[in-house]
Amino acid sequence: MRLLVFISFLFTFNAFTQSDFGPPYDPTFGIVQSNIPSSYYQQANGLSGEGLKEALYQIISNHIVYPYTSSSTDTWDILQQSDQDPLNHNNMILVYTGRSQDKGYRDGSGNYSQYENGNGTQSNSWNREHVWPKSHGFPDEDDNAYTDVHNLKPCDRSVNSSRGTKDFDFGGSQHNEAIDCLTDNDSWEPADYIKGDIARILFYMVIRYDPGYDHNNNSFDLELVNYTTPNNNDPILGKLSSLIQWHIDDPVDDFERNRNEIIFGFQQNRNPFIDHPNLVNYIWGDNIGEAWNESLDLTTDKINNMMIFPNPSSGIINFNINLNNEKIQIFSLRGEKILEQLINNTNRLELDLPVGIYIIRSLTKYGILNSKVVIR
């Protein structure tokens, strides 16, 4: 059964062309569809609190484990598919820098001596970033969490070293190579376009490995905390409040959704927070204690989680859901209606407006959303 699913998935993936969806730094929405098995989240329906977390753990915990490095299929191979540059399939997108880089220019490949420093190291080769640092709970390569590809991202070698084991939080100074990132002594702030991706990886990890088991069958529980944890190798990581905000500000895009599908094709487990972003509200947010149901994504939570971005904008507005036969109205701050437009099967709106602040009213089948947008 797993073999059939995997073959079907690969066929679907290979059908993509370079123009199907965008990279993280120029995101698209609504092109890549989630292929969630019909009953995948069924046992989580109607649950809340710890019961909901336990059900999600049971759903995603029994995944297929691949070796970290091997002559057979390993994490290097999977990442070259999951993080492939949609605009150049010979390349992959590196986390933090957003750089498109030849898949072969990686640690240990031996094929790119022209890029090496005098001591034989390749400071700009790519290696594997553990988004949840491996030293915070699973330091051994034989541990399942160590090789979980949901937690791995291709990264510039020197940038990976700079991030180290720092927590994620706002603030710091601009990094000299990953120029969209900020860092200080105890934290790392990724680029705006990847913030939500990072947050959802960490949300996955804290559900998947609560509890986790190392190669000696000793248990550990990963936990997100609301503070930074410098010089600490406990299985904790911060900063939860910042991660929740990043999850809100940077919604799931096509690149992230496609990555989830690729990894599911190999590991046979999914990231629930990519499939159902509203789960964050039920585990850490305003809906704690309320029963979650998968069908909520199709009703009131659509409008509650609907977002418009980027904001400020140069004139192109994106919605994080696809709009089909729904009306958009634009008003000045004085209440004058400037534009009314029917949106059909798209999530993008191009505006030709003077610089200023406007109110966008979205009249959808889920409800009405009023948003203040800055055009610059």
Question: Where would I find each of the regions flagged by the language model?
Answer:
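Betabetaalpha-Me/HNH-type nuclease active-site subdomain
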Residues: 53-173
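Domain-level detector of nuclease and nuclease-like folds
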Residues: 116-294
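Low-complexity, Pro/Thr/Ser/Gly/Ala-rich linker/spacer regions in secreted
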Residues: 18-19, 287-302
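Bacterial Sec-dependent N-terminal signal peptides
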Residues: 1-21, 336
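Boundary/junction segments of secreted and surface-exposed precursor proteins
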Residues: 16-60
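Short, flexible beta-strand-to-coil junctions
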Residues: 96-102, 206-208, 363-364
